[in-house]
């Protein structure tokens, strides 16, 4: 399905029934990042797996900015009139989730997996690889990761949504930045999975489903 938001067509897949759950993928992938987990989660939620602008089946764009992607997500929630949403975002999706929570009160629980506040929050070797790849491809997706996000402690402090900040102990994101996010969002819970990397707690379908179900139950209204 597609919906028009902010001058683009935003693609999403929907399945299941129950409390709305929005899944937001990372950079360079699309809703299929969650394809396996969706079929478990649909037993408990109405699942919406979205493609961010410039990704998947959503409208291609020449420039990408997290602020635009968060505006898209806020508009998506408003147009579908989704409330008390559980939102799980991974990597770039977690950045979008945090910035969306600054814009709307429609999210009832935010699970932010492996987000960074600044480009420097990502591993140095990754930034070097991204620069080399961008020099050749000029990809908007790579440029986005090299220049953004630029989220401040003050901005995080405006979030009133119950938030769980998640990462792996072997993540690509500097653990100090992960901890700063958790410290800056009022009342946020921090979960760092020992031995996990940037994606290993997301890819196995049962692990992600169990994580979302556990946290949604903990924060049930």
Residue map of PLM features:
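Conserved HGGG/HGGXW glycine-rich cap/lid loop of the alpha/beta-hydrolase fold
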Residues: 8-57
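Active-site loop/oxyanion-hole signature of alpha/beta-hydrolase fold enzymes
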Residues: 48-86, 210
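Catalytic active-site module of serine/aspartate enzymes centered on a nucleophile-bearing elbow/loop
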Residues: 188, 194-221
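Flexible "cap/lid" loop of the alpha/beta hydrolase fold
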Residues: 95-103, 110-136
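Short beta-strand/loop motif that positions the catalytic acidic residue
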Residues: 159, 165-167
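Active-site nucleophile elbow and catalytic-triad environment of alpha/beta-hydrolase enzymes
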Residues: 140-155
């Amino acid at each position: 399905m597609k919906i028009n938001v902010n001058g683009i067509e935003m693609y999403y897949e929907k399945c299941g029934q129950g409390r709305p759950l929005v899944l937001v993928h990372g950079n360079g992938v699309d809703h299929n990042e969650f394809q396996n987990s969706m079929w478990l989660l649909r037993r408990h939620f109405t699942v919406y797996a979205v493609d961010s602008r410039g990704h998947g089946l959503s409208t291609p764009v020449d420039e990408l900015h997290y602020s635009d992607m968060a505006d898209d997500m806020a508009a998506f929630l408003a147009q579908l009139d989704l409330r008390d949403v559980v939102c799980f975002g991974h990597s770039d999706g977690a950045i979008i989730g945090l910035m969306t929570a600054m814009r709307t009160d429609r999210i009832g629980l935010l699970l932010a997996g492996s987000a960074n506040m600044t480009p420097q929050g990502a591993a140095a070797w990754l930034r070097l690889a991204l620069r080399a790849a961008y020099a050749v491809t000029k990809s908007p997706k790579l440029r986005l990761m090299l220049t953004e996000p630029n989220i401040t402690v003050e901005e995080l402090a405006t979030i009133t949504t119950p938030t769980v900040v998640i990462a792996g102990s072997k993540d690509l994101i500097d653990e100090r930045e992960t901890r700063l996010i958790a410290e800056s969002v009022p009342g946020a819970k921090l979960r760092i999975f020992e031995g996990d990397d940037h994606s290993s707690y997301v890819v196995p379908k049962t692990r992600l489903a169990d994580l979302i179900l556990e946290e949604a139950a903990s924060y049930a209204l």
